[in-house]
């Protein structure tokens, strides 16, 4: 399963409109499932930079450490080939950001269908099952 930036940002930012929902969702999906949680380095970058602007250095640092140290989270790193493939996905989906296109690329590469996100723009992407709710126990 992939987890989009908007979930991490809402979870860590008390002033975010999705904060309460993310506070219920994220711990549940990380504790109840045995699935690996994936983020990309683009998601980490987008999340940490947003938190640095909207919250504090400490919050941004804690989040970066969570991405790099948690045994439940795998961060996928990009190279020149993945950047070029992401660019192609970006051109196919003009309603999504470059980070979103990168998530789509990595999901296709890993044949992963589940994405936790509050971003309804992903609903238009064939093959992705966007979720806002926790999996059943």
Regions found by a protein language model. Give the residues of each.
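A general alpha-helix detector
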Residues: 7-8, 46-47, 85
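Short, well-structured N-terminal submotif of metal-dependent ribonuclease cores
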Residues: 1-37, 53-62, 133-134
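Short glycine/serine- and small hydrophobic-enriched flexible loop segments
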Residues: 49-52, 108
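Conserved glycosyltransferase catalytic-site signature
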Residues: 5, 41, 100-101
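Acidic, PIN/NYN-like endoribonuclease modules and their adjacent C-terminal/linker elements
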Residues: 104-105, 109-137
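Active-site flanking residues adjacent to catalytic metal/cofactor-binding acidic residues
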Residues: 3, 40, 118
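Active-site neighborhoods of divalent-metal-dependent phosphate/nucleic-acid chemistry enzymes
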Residues: 74-114
